[in-house]
Every structure is written in structure tokens, then in C-alpha cells.
Amino acid sequence: MVTINQLVGNARSIRVVKSSVPALESCPQKRGVCIRVYTTTPKKPNSALRKVCRVRLTNGLEVTCYIGGEGHNLQEHASILIRGGRVKDLPGVRYHVVRGALDCSGVKDRKNGRSKYGTKKLKS
């Protein structure tokens, strides 16, 4: 327990909460341009070819983003929107590409959870 005299000498320091998505700079999303689109393998014990892209944001920072869903149309120089959200089995990937925004198309033939993948309602 701290005494009053100890607190007079130096006040309690305020804990600084570190952001898990520093490149967004407190914004919900940020726009960027794809520099490189490639696949990478996840950590053990998982096995796959995860689709990721390197993005240069409007604030000048460069980040790695995960492209969710089955199939994508992203190429170099494509303008995309990114949001926060890490991918647990890909080290260094802390951002997701927003599907269905700017140059990134939504997932084709998606029936459930369409809002997460930028897919319009199917006309029946």
C-alpha cells in the first residue's frame, strides 16, 4: 500500500493502453493501394495457403492484410479498404480487407453471412 507522502512525491502513473491496430490511427477503416498480392502458410499446427496482400495506406504506412472468403480479384495497384482484426495463425497480419468495397469484389455465390463478405441478396 502506498502512503500519502509517497503519492505527494510522485503521483500514480496512468496506464497507457496500446492499440492492436496502430496503422488505422483511431479510424474504423483506412484506404490503401495493394503493393503485392501473395499466399503464405500459417503457423503450426494449421496447414493452408492463406491469401494476403501488402498495402500502402493513405497515411504512408505499409501493412499486411488478410483477404477473407473464397476467391478474390485483387491485383497490384488495386485500391482497397482495410479494417482491423488479426489472423491468429498468420504472424504479423493484423488487418483484414473489406470485401465489396472499392476495387475488391464481394464473394461470389455466398448465401450465409453475406454482410461480412460484401455479397448482395440473391434474386429468387
Swiss-Prot record:
Modified residues (3-methylthioaspartic acid): D89
Keywords: Methylation, Ribonucleoprotein, Ribosomal protein, RNA-binding, rRNA-binding, tRNA-binding
Keyword rRNA-binding: yes
Superkingdom of the source species: Bacteria
GO cellular component: small ribosomal subunit
PANTHER family per the UniProt record, alphabetical: 30S RIBOSOMAL PROTEIN S12 FAMILY MEMBER (PTHR11652)
Protein name, entry field: Small ribosomal subunit protein uS12
Organism: Blochmanniella floridana
Lineage, opening ranks: Bacteria, Pseudomonadati, Pseudomonadota, Gammaproteobacteria, Enterobacterales
